[in-house]
Amino acid sequence: MSRVLQDAEFISLNSNDVKVNKGGCAAVATWIKEKLDSLGPQFAEWQNHELHPKTRDVSTLDWIFLVDILNFSFWSDVDVEDSGKHSKRFSIEYKGKLYTGYWSLCAAINKALDAGIPITSPAFYADEKQCPDTLIASVFDSATVEKIPLLEERIRIMRASGRVLVDSYHGSYCGLLKKCHNQAQRLIKLLLADFPDFRDVSVYKGRECYMLKRAQILVAETWACFQGQNYGRFDDIDSITMFADYRVPQILWQLGCLSYSSDFKKRLLKNELIAHNDPMEIEMRGCSIWAVEKILQNINRKDVNAITIDFFLWDLAKEWQAKGYKPSTQVDEVTIPCIRVRSIYY
């Protein structure tokens, strides 16, 4: 059991305001298993998404790395519904289409590359002369009134991460991967040691608890893009857990895998800005990881791991969000929005 999973179990056993519903997890496992059977081997393939790279080479590795160091906090301050055709939330227009959330990040990077800006090159974005702050800001120019959240933090992280790759790993994520010898947990240790902004760790009831959303999703997206081969081969890939963000916990609650206290529900329904490392936030993230582990145990298939389930749930959440769909498991409940925490970790 990985450190993240051990800490998630500890949180779930001691949680006050978030609980894992084992019956709900078992029911959802049955439902997901049926979905996977009907979708077949093509389900949730990383390369099927229109904005993901279609080639499997070193340039794609650096694309993945840049996306994952910036993959955090895309929920909107101006649009509570967080979706809709007339949303004012941060958006990137690319090839005649508006993209929001994680997809706005992918669109911005692809748009810059199309314009001849080598934005995925660590040597480029580490260099303030070649790549000034104003250029990075222009890459993330919004098509709406809302600007990209935490722009200054994103620029800082790009500079710091790029310098580490240039100074220690031959200027590429590829150099970092070669040091991990096909071991996901070794890659994570290197990320935590050399890249401080991957250190997604909270203290809960006196215990240091690892969440590691972005470090783990970097492993997962590398694995998914390269389909477990070459740069994407990790012999311990099943040690990776669900990625504790703000979107998947929301759908886990909708599906009846999680239950929230009345106090936590009230805070979410008020769209309260909750501080990072608030106990309720830690409980939500830890219990989400443990809930997906329970789902995984109930599915009990060698070809399904926590990454598979997380990708499936995230895609489903975005689909339901776009359609305004509400599952029958919470039919008597108002829709609870995603947690509003401004953090560089998710």
Swiss-Prot record:
Gene Ontology biological-process entries: nucleoside salvage; tRNA-guanine transglycosylation
Consequence of gene loss (knockout): Lacks queuosine in tRNA(Asp). Supplying exogenous queuosine (Q) or queuine (q) results in q incorporation in tRNA(Asp) in the wild-type S.pombe strain, whereas the deletion mutant strain fails to utilize exogenous Q to modify its tRNA while retaining the ability to use q.
Active site per database record: D245 (nucleophile or transition state stabilizer)
Additional detail: Eukaryotes lack the canonical genes for de novo biosynthesis of queuosine (Q), present in most bacteria. Therefore, this molecule must be sourced from ingested food and/or the gut microbiota, and metabolized to its corresponding nucleobase, queuine (q), before incorporation into cytoplasmic and mitochondrial tRNAs. Incorporation of q into the anticodon of some tRNAs contributes to translational efficiency and accuracy.
Key word Hydrolase present: yes
CC terms in the record's Gene Ontology section: cytosol
InterPro entries with a match to the protein in the record: Q_salvage
Protein known as: Queuosine 5'-phosphate N-glycosylase/hydrolase
Family statement drawn from the similarity comment of this UniProt entry: Belongs to the QNG1 protein family.
Group of enzyme by EC: hydrolase
The EC number(s) this enzyme carries: 3.2.2.-
